Amino acid sequence: MRNLLLACLAFPFSLFGQDNAKPLSIKGSFKNVQPEPEWVYLYHRVNGTSVKDSCKVIDNAYTFTLKMVEPELLAFRVKYANAGSAKQFTPLAGGSTSNQSRDAFNVYAGDGRIRINSTDSFSNVSIKGSKHHEAYLALQALRKPYDDKMKVLYQDYAKANAKKDTEARDRVEAQIDVLESDLKENVLSGYIQKNPSSPAAFYALQQYAGWDINPDKVEPLFNALPAAVQEYPTVKSFKEQLETAKLTGIGRMAPEFTQNDTLEQPVQLSSFKGRYLLIDFWASWCGPCRQENPNVVKVFNQYKDKNFHILGISLDRAGQKDKWMKAIHDDNLTWSHLSDLKYWDNAVSKQYGIRAIPQNLLLDPTGKIIAKNLRGEALAKKMEELLEGK
C-alpha cells in the first residue's frame, strides 16, 4: 500500500559534482500534434535538486543538452500555444506508465544522443538511441498487468475512502498489499536476478526496495549490480540507506536517541524500556498520517494500561511548533511526543532511515524491534496477540 499511504515523501539524494558528467543530446519533433506545441519542459535532477528546463518549439522541433553523471528517469511535459502554463510534472510514483497524460511522458536515459518523435499526440512517442530506455520499456511491459490491476484497485480505494466505508477501504488495501508483494517478487526481483547488468536493473531495485528497505532481501540484489553501477552517486546514496536499514531491521535492538518533548525537555528512548513501545513517525502536515491517527488512538486507549505506550516523532517544520501542538490536541494524541522541528532533517528520522511517513516501529520491552509499519487492523491484531489476557 506504499503509493497510497506513503504520500508524504522525502527525496534525500547525495550532493555530487559533475566532474564525471557526460553529455546527453535530446532532439525532438512533432507530426500532426494538435493543439500546436509551443514549449517543451524537461524535469531532471542536478546535484540532487529537481530542475525544470524549457525549450521553445521552432518548426515543430526542440532540443535539450544535459550533463549526465548517471542514468535518470527524465520527465517531459508540453505547453500548447494559447494555453495556460504547464503544471509541475515529475516521473510517476512507482514507475507505472498506466496513468500517463497525453501531455506528458518519461524517458529513462544515460549519456549519448536520443531522438524523440511525437505523432498525433505529445505522448505518442518513438524514442531512438537509448539502450537505457529500451531496458526501461522492457521492464514496464513486465509490470503492465500488475499496474493495470493496481489502477483499478486505487480507484476502488478512493471511492471507499470518499464514502468513509472503512470496511471496504481496508479490504481493498489488503488486495493492494498482496498485488504489490506479487509485483515485487514475481517481476522486479526476478528481473534483477536475471538481468543484473541491465541498464534498468538499479531502477528496478529502487522500485523493489520501496521506502522501507528490507535488507535481507535487498542486499543480495544490490550486490549483484556491476561494480561500475555501484559507483553512481545515487547508488552510493542507496547503499547508505541500505546500511541504515540493516541497523533498524526487525530483530535488531532499536538505536538509542534523545530528543526534546513538547516542553523542551530531553527524552531518551531507553527510558521506555520495560514496555511495548510504538515509535510513530508523523507530522501535522502529513494527510495520510492524520488519516491513520484515529486507528492509533483506538489501539492506544485499549492497551495503554497493559504495558503499552506510544512515542510520536514529528517531522514538523521549524517555526511551526503551534501546528504540531494543534494536531496533537485536535487528534487526541495523548502519548509522548518528540521533535526537533527540522522537517526531513529530523535527527531521529535520519538515524532510522525514514524517507516517507507515516511509518512506525514496534519495540518489545527489551527495546528489540519486533514489527514495522503496522496500520489499521494490523496494529490492533498485533497488540491483541501480544497483550490480550495480560
Segments and roles (model prediction):
Residues 1-28, 389-390:
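Bacterial Sec-dependent N-terminal signal peptides
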Residues 18-178:
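A non-transmembrane, solvent-exposed segment enriched in polar/low-complexity residues
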Residues 237-270, 335, 382-389:
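N-terminal "domain-start" segment that seeds a small globular fold
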Residues 273-277, 281-298:
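Conserved redox-active cysteine motifs that mediate thiol-disulfide chemistry
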Residues 291-331, 341-350, 381:
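Structural microenvironment flanking redox-active thiols in thiol-disulfide oxidoreductases
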